[in-house]
């Protein structure tokens, strides 16, 4: 009888340790996705040298077209501003006052974006 209880206890402990290990691996791999994006005022909390997502509203009168497909603009969270440099095709919803998420790296005081995601507003309008 003692041997059966001991074997069952060992199996339970192995299952528990396996579950803990699996959950730890999942959380470790999801670490960079737990915070979807940083606002400009919290960008200093982000880990430097890694790819980041930063989000905010495109500040009015800040869009500066440098060349045919290179642009700079400023995003804000109404606390702090951050200059974004982007080279590529702009999303269709990109405009002043619109929310965006930029994916890239922080370089000095500028953010070099490799991808832009334009956020739409939360108001639903059915097609007419």
Swiss-Prot record:
InterPro entries the record matches: CcmE (IPR004329), CcmE-like_sf (IPR036127), NA-bd_OB-fold (IPR012340)
Cell compartments where the protein resides: Cell inner membrane
Gene Ontology, cellular component aspect: plasma membrane
Ranges of the Cytoplasmic topological domain: 1-8
GO biological process, one term: cytochrome complex assembly
Disulfide bonds: none
One protein family per Pfam: CcmE
Ligand binding (heme): 120, 124
GO molecular function, one term: heme binding
Similarity field: Belongs to the CcmE/CycJ family.
Protein name: Cytochrome c-type biogenesis protein CcmE
Biological source species: Rickettsia prowazekii (strain Madrid E)
